[in-house]
Amino acid sequence: MDGIIVIYKEKDWTSFDVVAKLRGIFHEKRIGHGGTLDPMAEGVLPVFVGKSARACDMLPCEEKEYVAGFELGMTSDTLDITGKVSEKKQTYFTKNEICDACGKFVGDILQIPPMYSAVKINGKKLYDLAREGKTVEREPRPVTVYEIEVLDFCEKTQTGKMR
């Protein structure tokens, strides 16, 4: 079988878990995906099967869109909800203040990848190194943020979309 399959990746599956499952279903070794989604993320994952796997690196699958809930004033050791809360403080912001702050991140920025991310350094995923208790030097990487939109706002939690 040759072609592109658009899969909805469930939370707690890695992108490689999806590829491994499809390799078993299709009895095909040549399967790749169009961009890593972190294990806690769910969403669309383009998968390239058979001869199409060669096109995987040629197609622009780098642009992603995230919809996420967030709570201001809370920090965890993993920088997401899967980690142990390390700090929690009261914050009081209006929706306009949050929207104005988000606007400062739109455009071309340099981002240091967090230790709990799927970015690879020397062939190892940062989140694997972090789980081993290791921290490595990470170089800032150019990232383009096209838009950030606050979708839902209440005093304690917010939902936003980032592309």
Predicted regions and their residues:
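Catalytic/RNA-binding core of pseudouridine synthases
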Residues: M1-R163
